[in-house]
Amino acid sequence: MVMSGMRRVDAVVFDVVETLFRLDAVADTLIGFGQDSSTLDVFFTRMLRDAFALGCTGTYRPFAEFADSSLAVAAPTLDDAQRGAVLSAFGELTAHSDVQPAFERLRSEGVRIAALTNGSATNTARLLDRNDLASFVEVVISVDEIQVWKPKPAPYRHALTRLDLPAGRVAMVAVHAWDTHGARAAGLVTGWASRLEGVYAAVFDPPDVRGAGLVEVVDGLIALAA
């Protein structure tokens, strides 16, 4: 074990959707309603785009509201009840296989764990519980608390406040390059796992640590010199 005084990172904050949890349940629900297998990507990409656009104009809407709006455009043949079922599937996500080993590795080193989501804290807490991960996570933080979406600096700084730690002692881990870029711009240490995007977009600030999966990333973060 590395002593805290010798380690750069004292806490790791994880993105939630796609970083910790798979979207298979949402995809399966869409396909069950006759949607094409590509609909999930169209929906999720549009949802992020719409959320970022609202953020750029200083407007905030909770996850359920803009997700429903984005889904109505991406899959216009779905009725209200079907859209509701698709959105409910966000509460049935399963964890990626590398999540628990990564959490166990951090706990073995005494590194605190938090989750930072653009969704709701309640749903995230339920996902952690249903996947037997809740005991690892000290705090679940939602952008709802400050009504500003990642990747603006405010959510990452809010996480620092909740953890009562300076930016240089906290790492943000995600599978989205835009998320690690946002965290780095806010002063946090960053780790990016390539299992979703494959290649890190060159327009973004590079992460401090990168790896194929979460275990490799957290190992790299633990190894960072103070």
Please give the residue ranges for each predicted region.
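Asp-based, Mg2+/Mn2+-dependent phosphohydrolase catalytic module
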Residues: 2-9, 104-107, 116, 120-121, ...
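Alpha-helical elements of Rossmann-like donor-binding domains used by nucleotide-donor carbohydrate transfer enzymes
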Residues: 28-29, 42, 69-73, 85, ...
